[in-house]
């Protein structure tokens, strides 16, 4: 617990912060959006035409990766990264720790005293980091140390900047020698492929031509911000990311006046800097606002392919922490850092698209929308049969602590359709008395 003197010192430090006035804004520049991403446009600029076409067919159409183009892609990626100031590269992956991992290697490959910057196709496609110290969920013993990172071309490489340099980050999957998933990305890629195959099979039953299946996601990110002076005086926050004891404030969220309230200048400055960093990485941060609890806020992006959206969310959390530190703040991403007020969820706005058709869009007359009703029924059955797997996928000490305590979602898996869709399903399922005709197009 903070003593009166340390609390007074912390408040004095906050009170002495310079107040920034309102200045004339310069014209808006957005030409830096995605500047640090090895995007489709960059590929077309740096790669031979045939190589770019082959790589894009893997990214956009899901065709198997042609290993013969790896050397050309690696060379182009290296040239682009060097021009952007990167001296190192890393296979960026997501072990079962809830965060990301990376091991940096320099491009430097000297021949005698002659410095040469090199990056081979093998360096791009695969790496062998030691996996013995990463959690495996009981899949293997510690002495089974070998692990492999494999390039995921469907998520573009990007440049991560720091104080005096930059690193080329290559998104990768992480697995064992026997193919067991040691990360979060591998199961996601496998499930995306399985769902895509099932959707194509279903659409074939409706007589639709073969189209690309896209699983879209827009993960909202909630977070708390507190001044670093208060944070450093709370060992529980420093060690666990949440408070373990303390007295509730006289006023917290009873008046519901913080939600969507006017954003304080210090916080708004922080948000602006966060968005600039996100936009450089091609992350479509769209919405920012005060959340329900005091000192709680939210950042929401536009929808993207689910694999890319999750990679972007990992970067969002990292950038929130980094920018908070630069503003004399600490960003708390624990799901329940304070008792008695809302915790921080990560609401996932999820959908399935077939070509340009959103399969979860009911349209103006859902009762006549056979495709929508079929997909909806399949999702309801899947949740009913596999709620244990869904619940397990979001189970963690922090999230289990949050669910059911001053939160909107309960601790169980459930579906709420609303009265209109609920009545629609009840009506169409009443086959004994009434039958309706459905236009299959």
Each language-model region and where it sits:
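Catalytic or ion-translocation cores adjacent to nucleophile or general acid/base/metal-coordination motifs
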Residues: 262, 312-315, 319-333, 340-341, ...
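Short, hydrophobic beta-strand segments
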Residues: 255-258, 297-306, 350
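Conserved small/polar residues in nucleotide/adenosyl-binding loops
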Residues: 427-436
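ATP/Mg2+-dependent ligation/transfer catalytic cores
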Residues: 147-275
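Active-site core of metal-dependent hydrolases
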Residues: 31-145
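Polar, glycine-rich mid-to-C-terminal structural blocks
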Residues: 374, 378-425
């Amino acid at each position: 617990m903070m003593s009166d003197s340390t609390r007074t010192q912390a408040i004095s430090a906050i009170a002495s912060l310079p107040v920034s006035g309102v200045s004339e804004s310069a014209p808006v520049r957005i030409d830096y959006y995605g500047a640090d991403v090895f995007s489709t446009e960059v590929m077309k600029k740096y790669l031979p035409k045939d190589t770019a076409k082959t790589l894009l067919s893997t990214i956009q159409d899901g065709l198997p990766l042609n290993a013969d183009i790896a050397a050309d892609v690696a060379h182009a990626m290296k040239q682009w990264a060097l021009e952007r100031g990167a001296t190192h590269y890393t296979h960026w992956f997501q072990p079962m720790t809830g965060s990301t991992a990376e091991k940096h290697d320099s491009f430097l490959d000297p021949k005698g005293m002659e410095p040469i910057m090199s990056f081979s196709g093998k360096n791009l496609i695969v790496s062998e980091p030691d996996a013995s110290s990463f959690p495996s969920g009981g899949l293997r013993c510690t002495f089974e140390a070998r692990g492999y990172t494999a390039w995921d071309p469907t998520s573009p490489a990007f440049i991560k900047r720091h104080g005096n340099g930059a690193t080329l980050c290559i998104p990768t999957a992480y697995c064992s020698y026997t193919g067991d998933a040691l990360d979060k990305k591998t199961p996601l890629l496998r499930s995306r492929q399985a769902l895509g195959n099932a959707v194509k099979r279903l659409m074939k039953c409706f007589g639709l031509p073969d189209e690309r299946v896209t699983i879209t996601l827009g993960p909202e990110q909630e977070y708390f911000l507190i001044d670093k002076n208060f944070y450093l005086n709370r060992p529980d926050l420093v060690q666990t990311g949440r408070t373990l004891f303390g007295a509730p404030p006289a006023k917290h969220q009873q008046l519901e006046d913080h939600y969507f309230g006017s954003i304080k200048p210090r916080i708004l400055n922080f948000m602006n800097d966060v968005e600039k960093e996100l936009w450089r990485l091609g992350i479509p941060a769209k919405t920012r606002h005060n959340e329900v609890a005091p000192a709680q806020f939210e950042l929401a992006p536009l929808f993207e392919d689910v694999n890319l959206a999750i990679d972007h969310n990992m970067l969002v959390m990292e950038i929130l922490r980094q920018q908070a530190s630069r503003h004399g703040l600490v960003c708390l991403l624990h799901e329940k850092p304070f008792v008695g007020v809302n915790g921080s969820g990560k609401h996932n706005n999820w959908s399935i698209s077939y070509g340009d058709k959103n399969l979860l869009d009911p349209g103006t007359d859902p009762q006549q929308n056979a495709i929508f009703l079929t997909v909806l029924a399949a999702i309801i059955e899947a949740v009913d049969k596999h709620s244990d797997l869904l619940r397990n996928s979001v189970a963690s000490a922090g999230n289990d602590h949050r669910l059911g305590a001053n939160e909107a979602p309960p601790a169980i898996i459930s579906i709420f359709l609303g009265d209109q869709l609920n009545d629609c399903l009840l009506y169409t399922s009443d086959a004994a008395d009434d039958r309706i005709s459905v236009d299959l197009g």
